[in-house]
């Protein structure tokens, strides 16, 4: 489960997750360079990351993932080395190394000069070095790569890679990449996805045993994005999910 950005994680929230036996959480620093966090508009500090991670370990969470981003604006290879050094000291159970992807709604997308710099050819070579360093760091922590995916607008045409220690891989991540996992999403703007097999469709339509071509079907239900509308229409949002998943 995504525990949230470090500035939004509280002991109370972690205790709720622990009480409900959530086995794996993600605490995502992106970088351990404060100047970069400030530049890209993140509200948390390096101190927040250390505090929240320590809190999670105190509560005996035994499977913690941390997300990092290679190629953030203004960061050098030396900055990434320092970030990885700090992550190694924390020794999470898995890391996911993302190559920078400029999303339309991000602060970076609104800063053309930084966006252009992030996509330059020379920057691509630096990113390659950063990604190699991350792989070496993961190996030192006893992790191996277990999943990989690409997304739109990735600088340098690189990819995102998940590394994990033995028995700590996020199997959910693999199922998502293979489009084999249904998702129940909660919150404004969240997207619920239902993956149906041909056999499930037969049962749903009252035709068990009928020979059909084995194909899966994927359907989605989107929550409204406006928080006020989401709260006002919460019953409708729940009903729409129910119709998709259980009717």
Regions from the PLM with identified roles:
Residues 36, 77, 106, 157, ...:
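Generic domain-boundary/flexible-linker signal
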Residues 105-186:
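A C-terminal junction/extension of Radical SAM enzymes
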Residues 162-247:
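Radical SAM enzyme core and accessory elements
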Residues 28, 63-65, 153, 157-160, ...:
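Detector for Asparagine
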């Amino acid at each position: 489960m995504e525990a949230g950005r470090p500035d939004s994680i509280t002991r109370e929230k972690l205790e709720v997750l622990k009480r409900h036996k959530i086995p794996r959480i993600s605490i995502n620093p992106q970088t351990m360079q404060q100047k970069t966090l400030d530049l890209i508009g993140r509200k948390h500090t390096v101190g927040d990351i250390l505090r929240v991670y320590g809190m999670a370990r105190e509560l005996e969470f035994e499977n913690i993932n941390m997300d990092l981003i290679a190629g953030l604006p203004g960061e050098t290879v030396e900055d990434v080395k320092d970030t990885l050094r700090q992550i190694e000291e924390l020794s999470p159970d898995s890391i996911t190394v993302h190559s920078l992807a400029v999303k339309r709604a991000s602060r970076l997308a609104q800063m053309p000069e930084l966006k252009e710099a992030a996509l330059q050819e020379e920057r691509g070579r630096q990113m390659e070095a950063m990604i190699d360093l991350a792989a070496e760091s993961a190996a030192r922590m006893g992790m191996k790569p277990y999943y990989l995916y690409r997304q739109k607008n990735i600088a340098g045409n690189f990819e995102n890679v998940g590394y994990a220690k033995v028995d700590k891989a996020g199997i959910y991540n693999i199922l998502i990449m293979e489009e084999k996992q249904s998702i129940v999403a909660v919150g404004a703007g969240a997207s619920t996805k239902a993956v149906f097999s041909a056999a499930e469709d037969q049962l749903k339509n009252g035709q068990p045993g009928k020979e059909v071509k084995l194909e899966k079907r994927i359907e989605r239900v989107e929550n409204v994005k406006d928080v006020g509308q989401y709260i006002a229409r919460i019953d409708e949002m729940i009903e729409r999910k129910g119709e998709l998943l259980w009717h």
